[in-house]
Amino acid sequence: MATVSAPVKRARRLRPAPLWLSLLLAFLAYFLLDFSLRLFYGSMSNVSLWAWQPLVFTLLWSGTMTAIAALLPRTGRRIFLLVTFVPFVLLAITNCVLYQLTGTCFSFADLAYAGDGARFISASYFRLSKGEWFSLAVCMAMMLCAVIFMPKARPGRRGRIVAAVLAVACAAGIVVVHNALAYRGDAQDRSEYLSWDNAESHDTFRDTYTDFSNPNRCLMLTGLYQYTVRGAAVTLWPQDTATDQRIAELDDYYASHPKAAADTPMTGAFAGKNLIFIMMESMDDWLVTPEYMPNLWRIEQEGLYFPNYYAPMFLSAGTFNSEFTANTGLIAPEHHVRNSYYAEHALPYSLANLFRDAGYSARSYHAANPNIYNRGQIHLNFGYESYNDYGDLGMDDYMLDSQLLRGYDQIVSDEPFFSFIITYSGHGPYTTEQQNISEPHLDRARAVIDYSTVPYTTEAQKEEYTRAVAQAMETDAFIGGLRERLEADGHAEDTVLVLFTDHYCKYFSDTELIEAIKGTSDHNLLSNVPFVIWTEGITPQVSEKYVSTMDIAPTIVDLFSLDTDLRYYIGNDMFGPDGGVVYFRNYAWYDGKTYDTGNDASTNPAVLAMREQVREQIDISQDTFRSDYFAYLQKRSGETEAK
């Protein structure tokens, strides 16, 4: 007689749970996944954890998915629950990690720029709190129990009818709540709804949901499931903003907002000179010291230095965000835009096009493959004649900025040239994963760092800080080598260097360390980074004006006396009287005295006026690009000339 092993006996005793219990566990897993995410990250916006909108959306989505599962046979039910639940667990983790790194949660727009960042994913970034991991584990355990102990039985006829009715009712409820929150009306109604003389109109939940351009607030307002579905819809299937009405509105705005060039002592100061335009990867202000980066520090001492320069991140892809704005003078839209727009929409006022119109060659240089961010095509659309990667530059290791100098003879020419360079070595993570960058400089880094001034609390933080400094030294080696070559061949006097950082040093695995280093935990204010202009023989200046990436293009236009229409740049000449205010994502702003996020009901007329200006100018700039407005201007101009 065959004997039955103890494990088999125990397995047989694991009876399937009643269907209602397994479905209840699934429902609770769906609901608690969202609730715990909003519980731990509620500080990312002013939406209450108990606001009815996210609670209702999440209850309805949880009900819809659970009711659909009830209608399926056991195998289909198990597959459906796992297929709908596991991706949302991964999205919840992604939102947590991105918020810790960038201050902004995930949006589908990030997928368009994921190529570069994906190669730098590090386990060190997944530093969720114990409470967060515990809540995720509880939710996953509940769903696994629901799946494992799912009975074979299906609901009876009456049960299936009830499940179908619940599924339809919950889905219909989602549509009803969506329609209740989304503003519907013509453009005039919309304009009045958002008018600033209506005290209740500013940044209401309805406004936030309709625009769906503030990821943090939208996630807290709608919950994980509705945020994901609506976010995918507005990003992957953007509405056509190039309507005749919107074009007419842009016409009216630009016609009523002329912008004349400011006549300053710096106007035309570099006319006829060459420009090497360098965007430095993650070179934060605290890295620029005579010990860490002596070459960049020297340039700051001898050049035109702006200590209050900020690099706001309107896209989570911080590098491309600054790359786009610095080159075009426009703010990159996050939603309602396809990645293809960047390679297709007309950009006649980009720096590359303006320099080429002035008789310069214009080429871009970056070690990364041209397929990353689709840079190869996008840079051509910016107006560059070519995009040159590590192979074109003769580099052996694309991560080493010092090897960019192998392409010096391509970057520098005896004919007028404009060269745009993006460095690489400062990119995180600051671990042994990138030791090919840090190892050559580690001994020197350890020798020059005064660890008594570094606010580290663990040995891991100390090592990460050291490797960040070592990687910055590699970028500094390129900067120093470039200056030496320019001086050696006589180009230092006829060539201008403009160096700016794409974003702050955001790749520390422990955000508390970078916050302690920079003295703030606000992700907007963390974006204070280096910006300097240098050429041989220039009189050093330090400007305390508050400026940002959006001011770069109009400043270069004025310095080099380029012919353009300044109305189409959202920023201002850094040396002129206008501007002095930094605009951030979600319409926050900072002028050195007032930092306003728009979350309070201010009655200060000056603050309200600035809020209106910031919101209007950001929307206009983003819609100018979204709607391909410059293509309409070119078409209109062509039709006029034909007549």
Task: Give a label for each model feature.
Residues 1-123, 129-133, 147-151, 642-643:
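Extended, compositionally biased non-globular segments that define protein topology
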Residues 248-643:
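Solvent-exposed soluble domains appended to multi-pass membrane proteins
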